[in-house]
Curated annotation (Swiss-Prot):
Pfam families: ELH (PF02323). One of its GO terms (molecular function) is hormone activity. This is Atrial gland and califin peptides. Residues 75-94 are annotated as: Disordered. The lineage of its organism: Eukaryota, Metazoa, Spiralia, Lophotrochozoa, Mollusca. The keyword Secreted applies. It comes from Aplysia californica. The modification Leucine amide is found at L152. Residues 22-34, 73-114 form a propeptide.
Length: 173
């Protein structure tokens, strides 16, 4: 019973939120409570996503901009946006194809791939080094065990020194 009443209260509160966020008409004008007004890249063409100011439809469509990762990390996007030929014109008809941004994206992808390859090579070198150290430690352990058995005079042909089970804990004594 409590779950049903909670569900009904939740639905009613969500429906009132949805109704209050929609646009209302007063004296023939449309008022939108939360208007999303954005500026173009040069700041001269403000457009409203509610289409009240008669902006061109291609101004309202968001454009994807690709910047080199170095500029993003250094925070140089805002300063270099004025020199960028993609952001100087707004119209899709006047803009050229995104070849500069795609080439910079390709360069960053190539640098990421080369970094990943170098990291993989470093990891392989580290694992090889660890494996050779383990092999050398195992050989030293076997040599020490062989010497101890020889010293004690208990060298027997049935004893296998090259299996991995030297001691129950896997170490030399």
């Amino acid at each position: 019973m409590k779950a049903n009443t909670m569900f009904i209260i939740l639905c009613l509160s969500l429906s009132t939120l949805c109704v209050s966020s929609q646009s209302t008409s007063v004296h023939g004008k449309i008022f939108v409570p939360n208007r999303a007004v954005k500026l173009s890249s040069d700041g001269n063409y403000p457009f409203d996503l509610s289409k009240e100011d008669g902006a061109q439809p291609y101004f309202m469509t968001p454009r994807l901009r690709f910047y080199p990762i170095g500029k993003r990390a250094a925070g140089e996007m805002e300063q270099s946006e004025g020199q960028n030929p993609e952001t100087k014109s707004h119209s899709w008809r006047k803009r050229s194809v995104l070849t500069p941004s795609l080439s910079s994206l390709g360069e960053s992808l190539e640098s990421g791939i080369s970094k990943r390859i170098s990291i993989n090579q470093d990891l392989k070198a580290i694992t090889d080094m660890l494996l050779t150290e383990q092999i050398q430690a195992r050989r030293r352990c076997l040599d020490a065990l062989r010497q101890r058995l020889l010293d004690l005079g208990k060298r027997d042909s049935d004893v296998s020194l090259f299996n991995g089970d030297l001691l129950p804990n896997g170490r030399c004594s």
